[in-house]
C-alpha cells in the first residue's frame, strides 16, 4: 500500500475516534441532565464539560440553576415550622384563633374578612425570626393554632408579657412560647413551641409569636427593665406587682367588662355607705357566688381561715375582711378535708388571670353581683358553674350580653323579659353577639345532653334555689309572655309594687285596660341594667272601687261563688268553655317551635280546640301574648291560627 494511502487511513481513523469521544461526552451530559431533572432538590453528578470548540447553553444557565437549587435547600433548612395557608384554618375576627374546629356562624361581612386577611398568597409565614431581642426570637404577624394557652393575661404590655414568660419556667406549666396581641394587649402563654404537633403556626395580622432563648441571663435583665420603666411607657396602667389594695381589673377579652367602670371609680367610702357589711357591689345589687366543684385556684392564697361551714367563708369574702385584715376578695377556695378557706383578690380565667387546678376535696367560689331582690327571694348563696360545659337542645333565648354578670342577670329576669323561667345558661366570653344562651332545662333534668365544649371559651351556670322562688316557683310557658297564667296551671305574674323601688327606680303609670289586663314598664334610666326595663302585668283594676278587682280568668273547675263580686256575663261562657289542659299547651308549644306562629300581627288567633284562650303577636313588645276569646263557639266560622290547620 502506498504511503499516501496509509496516511489517509490513519487520518480517517483518528477523526472517527475523535467523533466517538465527542458523542460519548454529549450522551453523558444529556443523561446527567435527565437525572438531575428527576430530582429538583439535588444533582447526583456534575455534567462533563463539552469539548473545546463545541457550543451549548453555556455555563451561565448551569450556574444559575445551581444557585437556585442551593437557595432552595438553604431556605428549607432555615424553615423552623410548618408552612400553610389561611384557608387551612376555620376562624373569624371575633373567634378564638387557637382552635381550628368548626365554630358557630358569625354575622360577619365578606369585606371585613378581606380586610382582616388581605391577600391569601401572603399568608405563608416567613421562616427567618427577628433576633434584635437577645432574649426572644420574634416571628412577626404569627399565631399558634390547634393549641390552647395555659394562661391568658389581659391589659398587659409586651415587657410584662416577656417577664411573666421568663418567670414561669417552674411549676405546673412552663412557658415555652407566647403570642402577644398588639391591639388588645393580650398575652397568651403556651407550654410548648408553636410548631410542636398538633400545634402549627399561622400568619395573623396584629399578633406576634415569641420563643424564649437565654432564660437565665435574660430573667434578671427583663425584671430590671420592667421595674425601672418610666410611668409614661405603654405599661403604665399594668404594673408588674400591684399592691393587694389596688388590684388590676383583669378582663377575659375586650367583650367581658365585669362592672369595669364601677370597679375603677368605686372608693372605700362609697362601699361603706352603700352597705354596712362593706359589700363591694353597687347599689341595688348584692354579692353571691358561683361554685365550681373539684377545682381550686392555683397559687393564689392571700389569706387563710379555718371555719366550721363554707357559709362563713362567703360572709368573710363579702365583707372583704379576713382575720381582721382588709382584702378586696374576689374568690375563695374551700377545702372540705381541713375546713379551711383560702381567700384571694384574684379570679380565674377568663375573668381574671388565675388558673384552676383539679382537686377532689376543693371547691372554687367566685364572687358576682346580682339583683338584691333576687338574693332575698332565693336564700341560696351559691350557684353552680361549670367551665367548658354546655347543655344542648334547650335554648329558649339567645341575646347579646357585654359581660358574664349581665348574662346571669338576664337569666334571673328571664320571665319579665322573655316570658319563661331560666334554669341554666351559657356565656361565650369571646363572642360579641349572641353570646348569652338561656335554657329552660339544666344538667339535672337533661343529663345526657350535658356535654363538654372544647372549641370556645364558655361557662355553663345554673340558677336553682334551695327553696322555690316567690310567685315564680312553677315553670311558665317557654317563649310566651303569660298574661293569663292562672289558666295554664301556673302562678300569676301580678306583683303589687309602689311607684318607687328600693334602688330608686320608678315605674310608669298603668296602661288602659285591654283584654282584662293592664301593663306598665320600669323607667329605663340606666340601659346597662336590664331590670330597669322590666314589665309588669296585672288584672284590670276599677279605680272607683278597688274591691271589685278580681281575676279575669279562673282555673277550670275552680270557679268560686263570691257574693261580694259581680260576675260578668262572659265568665259564664268561660266556665262552659273550659281552659286548655297541660297536654294541649305542651302540644301547642311544640308546634310553635317546629313550624312557628303564623297569625296576623296584634290579632287574637285560636290555637286550641276551645275558644277560652288564644295567642297574639304583639308588634309593640315583640312577644307572644295570651289573649281571651279568639273565637265565638256559637259561630260556625272564626279566625284561627294555622297551627290548627
Curated annotation (Swiss-Prot):
Which SUPFAM superfamilies does the entry link to? Hairpin loop containing domain-like
What GO terms in the biological process aspect are recorded for it? Answer: anatomical structure morphogenesis
Q: What are the protein's UniProt keywords?
A: Disulfide bond, Glycoprotein, Repeat, Signal
Q: Which domain of life is it from?
A: Eukaryota
Where are stretches of biased composition, namely Polar residues?
A: 92-102
Entries under InterPro entries matching the protein? Celegans_DevNeuronal_Protein, Pan_app
What start-end ranges are recorded for coiled-coil regions in this protein? none
The residue ranges of the PAN domain are 135-214, 281-369, 378-465
Stretch list, region Disordered: 30-58, 92-129, 225-247, 556-582
> What is the protein name for this chain?
Uncharacterized protein F52C9.5
Amino acid at each position: 500500500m502506498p504511503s499516501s494511502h496509509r496516511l489517509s487511513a490513519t487520518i480517517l481513523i483518528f477523526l472517527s475516534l475523535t467523533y466517538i469521544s465527542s458523542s460519548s461526552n454529549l450522551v453523558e451530559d444529556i443523561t446527567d441532565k435527565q437525572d438531575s431533572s428527576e430530582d429538583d432538590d439535588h444533582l447526583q453528578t456534575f455534567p462533563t464539560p463539552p469539548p473545546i470548540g463545541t457550543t451549548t447553553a453555556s455555563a451561565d444557565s448551569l450556574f444559575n440553576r445551581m444557585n437556585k437549587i442551593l437557595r432552595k435547600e438553604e431556605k428549607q433548612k432555615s424553615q423552623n415550622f410548618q408552612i400553610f395557608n389561611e384557608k387551612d384554618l376555620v376562624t373569624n375576627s371575633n373567634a378564638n384563633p387557637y382552635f381550628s374546629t368548626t365554630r358557630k356562624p358569625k354575622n360577619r361581612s365578606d369585606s371585613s374578612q378581606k380586610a382582616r386577611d388581605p391577600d391569601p398568597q401572603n399568608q405563608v409565614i416567613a421562616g427567618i425570626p427577628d433576633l434584635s431581642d437577645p432574649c426572644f426570637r420574634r416571628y412577626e404577624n404569627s399565631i399558634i393554632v390547634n393549641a390552647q394557652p395555659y394562661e391568658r393575661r389581659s391589659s398587659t404590655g409586651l415587657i410584662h408579657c416577656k417577664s411573666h414568660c421568663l418567670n414561669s419556667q417552674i411549676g405546673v406549666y412552663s412557658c415555652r412560647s407566647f403570642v402577644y396581641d398588639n391591639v388588645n394587649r393580650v398575652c397568651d402563654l403556651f407550654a410548648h413551641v408553636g410548631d410542636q404537633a398538633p400545634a402549627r403556626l399561622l400568619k395573623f395580622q396584629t399578633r406576634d409569636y415569641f420563643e424564649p432563648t437565654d432564660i437565665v441571663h435574660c430573667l434578671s435583665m427583663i425584671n430590671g427593665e420592667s421595674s425601672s420603666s418610666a410611668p409614661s411607657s405603654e405599661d403604665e396602667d399594668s404594673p408588674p406587682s400591684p399592691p393587694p389594695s389596688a388590684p388590676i381589673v383583669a378582663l377575659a377579652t375586650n367583650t367581658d367588662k365585669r362592672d369595669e367602670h364601677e370597679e375603677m371609680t368605686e372608693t372605700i367610702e362609697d362601699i361603706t355607705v352603700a352597705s354596712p357589711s362593706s359589700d363591694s357591689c353597687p347599689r341595688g345589687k348584692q354579692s353571691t357566688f358561683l361554685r365550681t366543684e373539684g377545682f381550686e385556684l392555683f397559687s393564689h392564697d392571700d389569706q387563710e381561715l379555718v371555719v366550721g361551714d363554707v357559709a362563713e367563708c362567703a360572709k368573710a369574702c363579702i365583707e372583704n375582711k379576713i382575720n381582721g385584715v382588709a382584702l378586696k376578695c374576689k374568690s375563695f377556695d374551700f377545702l372540705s378535708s381541713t375546713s379551711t378557706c383560702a381567700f384571694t383578690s384574684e379570679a380565674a380565667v377568663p375573668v381574671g388571670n388565675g388558673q384552676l387546678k383539679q382537686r377532689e376535696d376543693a371547691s372554687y367560689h367566685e364572687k358576682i353581683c346580682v339583683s338584691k331582690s333576687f338574693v332575698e327571694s332565693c336564700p341560696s348563696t351559691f350557684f353552680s358553674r361549670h367551665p367548658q360545659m354546655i347543655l344542648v337542645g334547650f335554648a329558649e333565648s339567645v341575646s347579646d350580653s357585654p359581660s358574664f354578670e349581665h348574662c346571669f342577670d338576664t337569666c334571673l329576669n328571664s320571665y319579665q323579659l322573655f316570658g319563661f323561667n331560666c334554669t341554666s345558661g351559657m356565656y361565650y366570653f369571646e363572642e360579641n353577639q349572641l353570646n348569652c344562651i338561656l335554657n329552660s332545662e339544666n344538667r339535672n333534668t337533661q343529663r345526657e345532653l350535658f356535654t363538654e365544649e372544647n372549641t370556645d371559651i364558655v361557662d355553663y351556670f345554673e340558677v336553682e334555689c334551695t327553696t322555690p322562688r316567690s310567685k315564680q316557683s312553677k315553670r311558665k310557658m317557654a317563649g310566651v309572655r303569660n298574661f293569663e297564667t292562672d289558666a295554664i296551671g301556673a302562678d300569676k305574674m301580678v306583683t303589687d309594687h309602689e311607684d318607687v323601688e328600693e334602688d330608686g327606680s320608678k315605674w310608669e303609670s298603668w296602661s288602659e285596660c285591654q283584654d282584662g289586663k293592664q301593663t306598665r314598664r320600669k323607667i329605663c334610666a340606666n340601659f346597662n341594667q336590664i331590670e330597669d326595663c322590666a314589665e309588669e302585668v296585672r288584672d284590670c283594676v276599677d279605680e272607683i272601687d278597688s274591691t271589685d278587682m278580681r281575676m279575669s280568668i279562673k282555673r277550670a273547675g275552680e270557679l268560686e261563688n263570691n257574693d261580694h263580686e259581680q260576675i260578668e256575663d262572659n265568665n259564664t261562657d268561660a266556665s262552659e268553655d273550659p281552659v286548655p289542659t297541660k297536654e294541649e299547651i305542651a302540644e301547642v308549644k311544640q308546634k310553635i317551635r317546629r313550624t312557628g306562629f303564623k297569625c296576623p300581627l296584634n290579632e287574637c288567633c285560636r290555637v286550641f280546640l276551645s275558644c277560652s284562650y288564644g295567642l297574639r303577636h304583639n308588634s309593640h313588645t315583640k312577644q307572644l301574648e295570651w289573649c281571651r276569646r279568639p273565637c265565638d263557639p256559637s259561630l260556625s266560622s272564626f279566625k284561627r291560627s294555622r297551627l290548627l290547620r
